């Protein structure tokens, strides 16, 4: 189950957490890779699959322009967005109370957990680490992707852009991103 939608996880603040999507079969080394990155880059969120935020001047570009990166030198940056389909490591103490604010979640970002988490990372200036050797895309379980969030968020409805715009208007994420650099 993912971190945001599982209620009652306030006690995870003091713990390391690894999230994976429950509709995928992951490579055997998924957790090992995440832990290895976390040892090298403590106090950062770590992901096996990364997108890079793309800007048009001082504004965020549309989500489809955020490049998905499967292979790159390991780096830690505010530009990196950890994508849940690769598994994500969260260090202890990385988030604030708003992470579990269901009123804000339901109003601004009800179905894009990766973006909700990224917005909270930007607010707290928490970098995301990713990269290294090629990480193969996990195998989709049959019949699980017909109505997946990924299709709704990235498909014709394009909910990712709508939800990111709403979060940006709420918290001025573009200003935080430009001020704090990449």
Segments and roles (model prediction):
Residues 17, 87, 109-110:
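A residue-level structural signature of the nucleotidyltransferase/glycosyltransferase Rossmann-like core
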Residues 11, 62-66, 147-149:
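Short, hinge-like loop/turn segments at secondary-structure boundaries
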Residues 14-25:
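Short beta-strand-to-loop acidic/aromatic patch adjacent to the donor-nucleotide binding site
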Residues 2-13:
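Single conserved hydrophobic/aromatic residue that forms the stacking wall/gate
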Residues 20-22, 48-49, 91, 113:
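Short His-Asn-centered micro-motif
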Residues 14, 41-44, 126:
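Short, high-confidence coil segments that cap the C-terminus of an alpha-helix
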